Curated annotation (Swiss-Prot):
Gene Ontology cellular component annotations, sorted alphabetically: 3-isopropylmalate dehydratase complex
Family (UniProt): Belongs to the LeuD family. LeuD type 1 subfamily.
Name by which UniProt lists this protein: 3-isopropylmalate dehydratase small subunit
EC annotation from Swiss-Prot or TrEMBL: 4.2.1.33
GO molecular function, one term: 3-isopropylmalate dehydratase activity
Source organism (scientific name): Yersinia pestis bv. Antiqua (strain Antiqua)
Length: 200
């Protein structure tokens, strides 16, 4: 996995609370088990006027010219609620998002995000309100999300957030569960050599 230390990116404001995983990636697109190819279906029912023609909805935030290429999603409370599909962070990262900033996240989505190198940043509702206004008034504004310092820098101000130290360590060092295991490969090999022949 790629290391996540600091990210600078354009911000797209999704001004909706309780965005569930079925809105993020509808169930009809879940047949695949690989992590790629889901970005084209991200927010499918909101991005397109109908599923057959795939005509873009001109009013949806991700279709607006000013937010093309956004890599940071600004959202409202309880983002990622609903079913526990891991396809939701897959779709967000495949579309190009590196960070989601919101007042709160559904627990399962929050864990899945870290597992897929998508950084979920929790800020207070007051700070989120300020950031929505900032993005609305400043076309092309970029945020600096610093995982080492645990800050979001925007509009000349710094907003502090907290990440569990273990998860922070894993993201900064680009470690997934396999990578963590391989860090102890020497100890695992030594233990295996100590086992009786019939257990090897």
């Amino acid at each position: 996995m790629a290391k996540f230390i600091q990210h600078i990116g354009l911000v797209a404001p999704l001004d909706a609370a309780n965005v569930d995983t079925d809105a993020i990636i509808p169930k009809q697109f879940l047949q695949k088990v690989t992590r790629t190819g889901f970005g084209q279906h991200l927010f499918n029912d909101w991005r397109f006027l109908d599923d057959a023609s795939k005509v873009p909805n001109p009013d949806f935030v991700l279709n607006l010219p000013r937010y093309q290429g956004a890599t940071i999603l600004l959202a409202r409370e309880n983002f990622g609620c609903g079913s526990s599909r891991e396809h939701a962070p897959w779709a967000l990262t495949d579309f190009g998002f590196k960070v989601v900033i919101a007042p709160s996240f559904a627990d399962i989505f929050y864990g899945n995000a870290f597992n897929n190198q998508l950084l979920p940043v929790t800020l207070s509702e007051a700070d989120i309100d300020t950031l929505f206004q900032l993005v609305k008034e400043n076309e092309g504004i970029e945020f600096v999300v610093d995982l080492e310092q645990q800050t979001v820098n925007a509009g000349g101000k710094s907003y502090a957030f907290e990440i569990d130290p273990f998860r922070r360590h894993c993201m900064i060092n680009g470690l997934d569960s396999i990578g963590l295991t391989l860090q102890h490969e020497h100890n695992i090999s030594a233990y295996e050599k100590q086992q009786p022949e019939f257990l090897r």
